[in-house]
Amino acid sequence: MSKFSPPINRNMVELDRSFFHKEVPLLAAYFPNPKFLGQFVKSCQNDILYVQTVKHIISMDDSKAILLRDDVKSISDLNPETQLKINEFGIILKPYTLKLDYSFWKSEEILKSILPENLIDDVPSGFSQAGHLAHINLRDEYKPFGKLIGQVILDKNPSVLTVVDKVNTIANKFRTFPLELLAGEPNYIVEQSESGCKFKFDFSKVYWNSRLSTEHERIIGKFNSGDVVGDVFGGVGPFAIPASKKNVIVLANDLNPESYKYLQENIKINKVEPFIKPFNLDGREFIRKAPELLLQWHNSQNGIIEKKIIKKVSIDDNKTKKNFERKPIIETTKIPKFYHHFVMNLPDSALTFLDEFIGLYGSNPQLKTDPEFKLPIIHVHCFEKFENNENPTPEELHNRVYEKICKLIQFPLNKEKMEFHEVRMVSPTKPMFCVSFELPEEVAFKQSK
């Protein structure tokens, strides 16, 4: 065990910070003349104490000293060059006691010193964070020690004010879980920044996953200004709001009334009202009504979104010096009557909603005569879980998902034109994919019998 390891108490029930106190005996190189400090540090790196958060240069007896490696007991333990410098600079070796307390050790080190020995190999010190709230997923064997773990995480992360754990792993239809407060304030209303936008929501009542921020940005990067996007399971707006900031026209939907409430609030916070319409519908109903909802929006705005922006305008023709003033300008964006993209971020069940796209435009066959018409790209998230005794290749997993999609939309897609993106591994046997494909004309315009 290192001299710098924390003291051990595996019987601790409530966190006792005062227990974490340790004194480490060291030797310090005392400089009667501190002008030699810089030269010594440069020449004697291998004999200087370098330990996390410990300053190796200290004040001592109206001058300065440098802490030496913790295994140095006398001058003979030092490198020959260091011994020469000690004599050359008139350095005196003096004993020094380094005092360590609770603040010195990282959360993982503290937890390894207080949890049962059979649990220290995989200490749960990591977490995902939304605003001031840290969310950990404790395995069953760690749950009896949840309060201890939560308090240490709270102490060691200044931006965290609340630490929670899932009571169980069975989500309701809104993808939310009952939470247990482990430490800190019982305040679940958080403010989170992502993709240049601000989001406010009640973490206990809506779905939010900070680990998906890269995926949000990846999908948003596929949208162009003026595109129309249907966000089927939009939550509080992690896709919709950043997209609408780049003048993407978004119809955002979520079944959860709380998500819908905060989606509306986040639209106002981010001032993207002209480009986004929120809905509180079942996903199937939203897909079914999507063309009608878009047409209603188009007609209510005479096919145009107007956005007031402030622009610098030149007011002087002088070529050597130009003067500008800020003027309000009305920027216009045409509202198409068709969708460019649909986002389906509900990996547990999004695939099962794909059959609703059959006949999406079936009642409006003349739509494809629009010279600007494009078929929508579907971005559907899904899990493709496999057994522990399996070792499928990515290609095999892609094929499994491909077959499911073709069966659901009742059409043999060209697999070569589809994109299979692995978002993350939720567990060793549970990859999450996002599959992107163009909805075939034969499917989109299929007539209902």
UniProtKB/Swiss-Prot annotation:
PROSITE patterns: SAM_MT_TRM5_TYW2. GO terms for molecular function: tRNA (guanine(37)-N1)-methyltransferase activity; tRNA methyltransferase activity. One of its GO terms (biological process) is mitochondrial tRNA methylation. Gene3D superfamilies: Met-10+ protein-like domains (3.30.300.110), Vaccinia Virus protein VP39 (3.40.50.150). It holds the Pfam family TYW2_N_2. S-adenosyl-L-methionine binds at residues 216, 254-255, 282-283, 345. One of its GO terms (cellular component) is cytoplasm. Keywords: Cytoplasm, Methyltransferase, Mitochondrion, Nucleus, S-adenosyl-L-methionine, Transferase, tRNA processing. It comes from the Eukaryota. It catalyses: guanosine(37) in tRNA + S-adenosyl-L-methionine = N(1)-methylguanosine(37) in tRNA + S-adenosyl-L-homocysteine + H(+). Its EC number is 2.1.1.228. It is found in: Mitochondrion matrix; Nucleus; Cytoplasm. Signal peptide: none annotated. Specifically methylates the N1 position of guanosine-37 in various cytoplasmic and mitochondrial tRNAs. Methylation is not dependent on the nature of the nucleoside 5' of the target nucleoside. This is the first step in the biosynthesis of wybutosine (yW), a modified base adjacent to the anticodon of tRNAs and required for accurate decoding. Monomer. Belongs to the class I-like SAM-binding methyltransferase superfamily. TRM5/TYW2 family. This is tRNA (guanine(37)-N(1))-methyltransferase. The gene is TRM5.
